[in-house]
């Protein structure tokens, strides 16, 4: 059976995912068979495995850092919020329905926990070590009875817990001490150390606080991790989008329309590595700049709600004016559906309306169906689109959607010959169900260089290639920083190495 160790946090977004990845990568580079695990994840940013299962993106990155193909056992439960009060529940890669928080815990808690135990035991039989990531905070007293992602998992795996706090946001010492106070006595015994994450400044000035923390709690500080800029780690929720967007002036400005249920924003991850691209998220009318070279409508977990959000804020009028100028617009998955004439929902898969008028920029109609398509796929473009350089070439990506979209008029074209079309175009407007479109190097390179030439700029020939290789380089960087700033000898002692 594998030995385990777990990272829990004083709050969401303190860096549990990155530290889990870092230790997993270190163990992998040191020659051990290691796998990541997170019992339950809540995220809109998901991934499709080779066998068509859906799982959280953070565990995908952690699996890659371990040299593994991602498997749903690494994240057996995924909650994808579809409203402020409800989520689609994914268990071992497959959706089992939409539930409110209350109904989920009342109706599905025991079944879900059995799936978690089975998934963990499967991994524990195959690997030397399991590095586990918790969720949120283990000290949410109102949620503790139903919390399966933190201490319950730690007890299942007999995993010592490293408690992580984000010192960049302030209040880190209070949050560590407060979290320890709110844990039950047997839970406190599981905590083997603290890590202060995202530190900027003079470490000497921090040392008195570390001494105080150790004396106050009796728990050792295992390390102080510095703030690492421009991490290429997939974000799981839109809270952290602003931290990943460049604020530096660059030649090309790409606007990404933001809405409350934005999903799969890893579609734009590669742009972080393009030397001439500035990504700007469009939340308000004021954010919609006149000098955008390209605008993207991303995926959505609730297309109708996000369509209404755009209309209520007048962003639909901005999009009409933008397209009228002949400027390029790309919609991905939910973005494609929003660009069409209307959305049909006869079985009320997404909401309470059976028919909704969309933006009408593409001549398409989307119908939501109960069965969900989740698969990796590729399609060959069978006719040239005239602008986006798709000329009988194969593009690949993955699909996650309930909708089926078809042509409804003559102004738009289907560019591929699949049974359920994946790529639609009308002039300089492109819509597709393919997540990962921009990871196709040839497509991204040609598009960006075309945008440059339209501004009178020379193209760039040596652009980044292979997002996979870029990620691996990034994982090595994170592991190196972890080795330099964390007491790895002590952690290895805890693991019995």
From Swiss-Prot:
This protein's record includes keyword Thylakoid: no
Record InterPro entries: Class_I_gatase-like, CobQ/CobB/MinD/ParA_Nub-bd_dom, CobQ_GATase1, CobQ_N, CobQ_synth, GATase_3, P-loop_NTPase
Annotated catalytic residues: 333 (nucleophile), 435
Domain GATase cobBQ-type, first and last residues per copy: 251-443
Pathway stated in the Swiss-Prot or TrEMBL entry: Cofactor biosynthesis; adenosylcobalamin biosynthesis
Molecular function as annotated in GO: ABC-type vitamin B12 transporter activity; catalytic activity
A biological process term (GO) from this entry: cobalamin biosynthetic process
Keywords from the UniProt entry: Cobalamin biosynthesis, Glutamine amidotransferase
Gene3D superfamilies noted in UniProt: 3.40.50.880, P-loop containing nucleotide triphosphate hydrolases
Keyword Lipoprotein listed: no
Function noted in UniProt: Catalyzes amidations at positions B, D, E, and G on adenosylcobyrinic A,C-diamide. NH(2) groups are provided by glutamine, and one molecule of ATP is hydrogenolyzed for each amidation.
Family matches, as NCBIfam families: cobQ (TIGR00313), PRK00784.1 (NF001989)
Similarity comment: family membership: Belongs to the CobB/CobQ family. CobQ subfamily.
Protein name as it appears in the record: Cobyric acid synthase
Organism: Carboxydothermus hydrogenoformans (strain ATCC BAA-161 / DSM 6008 / Z-2901)
């Amino acid at each position: 059976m594998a030995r385990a160790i777990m990272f829990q946090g004083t709050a969401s977004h303190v860096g549990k995912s990155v530290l889990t990845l870092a230790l997993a990568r270190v163990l992998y580079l040191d020659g051990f068979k290691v796998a990541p695990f997170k019992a339950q994840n809540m995220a809109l940013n998901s991934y499709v495995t080779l066998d068509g299962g859906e799982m959280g993106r953070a565990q995908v990155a952690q699996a890659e850092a371990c040299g593994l193909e991602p498997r749903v056992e690494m994240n057996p439960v995924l909650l994808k919020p579809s409203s402020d009060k409800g989520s689609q529940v994914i268990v071992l890669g497959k959706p089992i329905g939409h539930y409110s928080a209350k109904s989920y815990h009342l109706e599905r808690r025991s079944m879900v926990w059995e799936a978690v135990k089975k998934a963990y035991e499967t991994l524990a039989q195959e690997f030397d070590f399991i590095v586990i990531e918790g969720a949120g905070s283990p000290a949410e007293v109102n949620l503790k009875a139903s919390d399966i992602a933190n201490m319950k998992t730690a007890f299942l795996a007999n995993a010592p817990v490293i408690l992580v706090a984000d010192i960049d946001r302030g209040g880190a010492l209070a949050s560590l001490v407060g979290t320890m106070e709110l844990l039950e006595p047997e839970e406190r015994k599981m905590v083997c150390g603290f890590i202060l994450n995202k530190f900027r400044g003079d470490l000497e000035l921090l040392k008195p606080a570390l001494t105080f923390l150790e004396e106050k709690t009796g728990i050792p500080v295992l390390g102080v991790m510095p703030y690492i800029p421009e991490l290429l780690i997939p974000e799981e929720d839109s809270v952290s989008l602003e931290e990943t967007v460049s604020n530096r002036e660059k030649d090309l400005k790409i606007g990404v329309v933001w809405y409350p249920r934005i999903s799969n924003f890893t579609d734009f991850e590669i742009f972080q590595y393009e030397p001439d691209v500035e990504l700007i998220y469009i939340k308000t009318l004021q954010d919609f700049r006149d000098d955008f070279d390209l605008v993207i409508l991303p995926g959505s977990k609730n297309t109708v709600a996000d369509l209404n959000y755009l209309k209520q804020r007048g962003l639909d009028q901005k999009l009409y004016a933008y397209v009228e100028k002949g400027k390029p617009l790309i919609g991905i998955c939910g973005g494609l559906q929003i660009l069409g004439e209307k959305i049909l929902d006869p079985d009320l898969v997404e909401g309470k309306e059976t028919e909704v008028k969309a933006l009408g920029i593409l001549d398409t109609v989307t119908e939501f169906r109960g069965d969900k398509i989740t698969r990796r796929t590729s399609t060959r473009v069978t006719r040239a689109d005239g602008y986006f350089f798709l000329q009988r070439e194969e593009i690949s990506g993955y699909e996650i959607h309930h909708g089926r979209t078809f042509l409804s008029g003559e102004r738009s074209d289907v560019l591929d010959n699949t049974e359920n079309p994946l790529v639609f175009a009308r002039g300089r407007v492109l819509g597709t169900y393919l997540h990962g479109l921009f990871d196709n190097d040839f497509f991204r390179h040609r598009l960006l260089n075309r945008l440059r030439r339209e501004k009178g700029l020379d193209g760039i020939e040596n652009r980044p290639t292979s997002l996979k290789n870029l990620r691996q380089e990034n994982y090595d960087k994170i592991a190196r920083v972890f080795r330099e700033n964390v007491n790895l000898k002590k952690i290895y002692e805890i693991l019995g190495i």
